[in-house]
Design a protein with these regions (language model features):
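Residues that define the transmembrane beta-barrel architecture of outer-membrane proteins
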Residues: 26, 42-46, 79-85, 109, ...
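Transmembrane beta-strands of outer-membrane beta-barrel pores
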Residues: 34-38, 64-70, 83, 93, ...
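Repeated loop/turn-to-beta-strand initiation elements of outer-membrane beta-barrel proteins
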Residues: 25-30, 56-62, 96-101, 144-152, ...
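Outer-membrane beta-barrel "beta-signal"
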Residues: 93, 173-175, 201-213
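Short glycine/proline- and aromatic-enriched beta-strand/turn motifs that initiate or cap beta-hairpins
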Residues: 19-72, 85, 204, 210-212
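Cleavable N-terminal export/targeting peptides
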Residues: 1-27, 213
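Outer-membrane beta-barrel architecture
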Residues: 49-51, 88-91, 137-141, 170-172, ...
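Detector for outer-membrane/organellar transmembrane beta-barrel domains
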Residues: 98-159
Length: 213
């Protein structure tokens, strides 16, 4: 968490230090991000995501994420590594030259590898599992004349044969330094319904760098 706060404090002054004007939204990009989470099973998240426009305000979306965590339960120590690949299609609806509504439908393939070691044993147990999730998203974005972009998005998760339900609210603030380079900060709140030991509420905070083309 301290690492994220330091990076955010370094980034915020840059968000307002330039008057570079961005000419509309560009949905052709590749970005790399780092986030932290207060979810019990995930501490750090590294991800790469991208978008390619295919015409008529449609885009192909992709993301690869690796999440890691470790924790102690009574008499045992555990670690987890999640890897997820997301593919989807997005559609934007322009309200004016600086504001648009965003929407997408994505499929997430999710792998979990977990280790468990009891304090009374020298043996480490290894387990793995797979699951898949469908994610529908809708949001709004605005780009100011100074190149500051604000994104607000609602993500609706339907996992495990569409029965498990979770919702997310995500807010991003991004500064475009040129037509090809931007840096952003983000905060996400995950609301699990119904909540369980492996599907609880959590918050993520992060930073990312975007390269447009």
């Amino acid at each position: 968490m301290k690492k994220i706060l330091t990076m955010a404090l370094m980034t915020i002054p840059m968000l307002f230090s330039s008057n570079i004007l961005a000419e509309g939204f560009n949905d052709n990009y590749l970005q790399v991000g780092y986030s932290t989470s207060n979810y019990k099973f995930v501490d750090e998240i590294m991800d790469i995501e991208g978008s390619v426009e295919i015409g008529n305000n449609f885009s192909i979306l992709g993301r690869y994420a690796r999440e890691t965590g470790d924790w102690r339960d009574p008499l045992e120590y555990e670690t987890s590594t999640y890897t997820g690949t997301t593919i989807g299609i997005g559609k934007t609806f322009e309200l004016d030259t600086n504001t648009s509504v965003t929407s997408s439908l994505s499929y997430l393939d999710y792998d979990l590898k977990q280790t468990q070691k009891y304090d009374s044993s020298s043996t480490t147990n290894h387990t793995s599992s797979k699951t898949n999730t469908y994610i529908a998203s809708v949001g709004v974005r605005n780009l100011s004349d100074s190149g500051i972009q604000t994104n607000l998005k609602l993500n609706i998760w339907r996992a495990g044969k569409l029965k498990s339900k979770s919702n997310e609210i995500e807010l991003e603030l991004m500064k475009h330094f040129s037509d090809t380079l931007a840096i952003g900060i983000r905060v996400l709140r995950h609301d699990a319904k119904p909540a369980s030991s492996y599907n609880s509420d959590w918050t993520e905070t992060g930073i990312y760098v975007r390269r447009s083309f």
